[in-house]
């Protein structure tokens, strides 16, 4: 009987440890991503080395490799958080918004610029070509639905157009991206002599969608 009890206790302890390990792994994985999110917000993309992320997370320099086989995997996990944040902000301004498609698209574009200017480090990381091209962790699966929201709104504003809505939406997005970057660098405020980005936003929409009906 004593031997049986000992074996039972040992088996129970092993099972308990096995159950704890995935939880601990998930917790450390999340801690590494959170450290990266905080680091990119504070110091920018250039600070996101594996060594620095590990230091911020309070783990050994080799720990990230256990959960993220490559640097791109970890950067992609951090970028996914950025896309999730942008998607949440987009949903917040569009859900329950009963305005016209043009008004909804204006709100979407404004949200995009606000995100780019308030989170410049994350914004730069999210649209890095190497991350999107590699599609680590299905990163494109989190970014493309946001673009589709833009395409759908363009299609409602200009239902019969050539080029098609996806091309118009792509040109509009490219224009907004350029405005965000040049404004963030200080080039556009200097060139326009204004600290108000709203006229540029409206001019961009007019250029791609036509003047708004008054």
Regions found by a protein language model. Give the residues of each.
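Amphipathic alpha-helical packing segments from all-alpha helical-bundle domains
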Residues: 134-159, 166-170, 195-207
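N-terminal intrinsically disordered/low-complexity leader segments
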Residues: 1-27, 213-214
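Amphipathic C-terminal alpha-helical segment
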Residues: 125, 173-191, 206-214
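Short secondary-structure transition hinges
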Residues: 107, 114-152, 185, 190
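Solvent-exposed, amphipathic alpha-helical segments
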Residues: 35-42, 85-96, 175-182
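Helix-turn-helix
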Residues: 31, 35, 39-73, 77
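Hydrophobic alpha-helical connector segments
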Residues: 77, 91-122, 165, 169-172
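Amphipathic alpha-helical linker/stalk segments
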Residues: 81-105, 137-152
């Amino acid at each position: 009987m004593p031997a049986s009890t000992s074996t039972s206790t040992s088996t129970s302890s092993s099972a308990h440890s096995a159950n704890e390990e995935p939880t601990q792994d998930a917790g450390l994985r999340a801690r590494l991503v959170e450290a990266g999110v905080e680091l990119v917000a504070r110091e920018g993309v250039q600070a996101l080395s594996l060594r620095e992320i590990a230091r911020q997370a309070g783990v050994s320099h080799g720990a990230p490799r256990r959960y993220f086989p490559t640097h791109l995997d970890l950067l992609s996990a951090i970028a996914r958080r950025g896309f999730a944040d942008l998607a949440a902000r987009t949903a917040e301004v569009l859900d329950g918004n009963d305005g016209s498609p043009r008004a909804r698209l204006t709100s979407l574009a404004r949200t995009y610029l606000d995100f780019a200017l308030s989170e410049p480090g994350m914004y730069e990381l999210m649209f890095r070509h190497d991350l999107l091209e590699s599609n680590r962790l299905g990163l494109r699966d989190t970014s493309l639905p946001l673009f589709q929201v833009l395409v759908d709104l363009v299609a409602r504003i200009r239902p019969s157009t050539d080029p098609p809505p996806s091309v118009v939406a792509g040109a509009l997005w490219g224009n907004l991206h350029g405005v965000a970057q040049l404004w963030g660098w200080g080039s556009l405020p200097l060139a326009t002599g204004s600290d108000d980005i709203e006229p540029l936003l409206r001019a961009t929409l007019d250029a791609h969608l036509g003047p708004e009906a008054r």
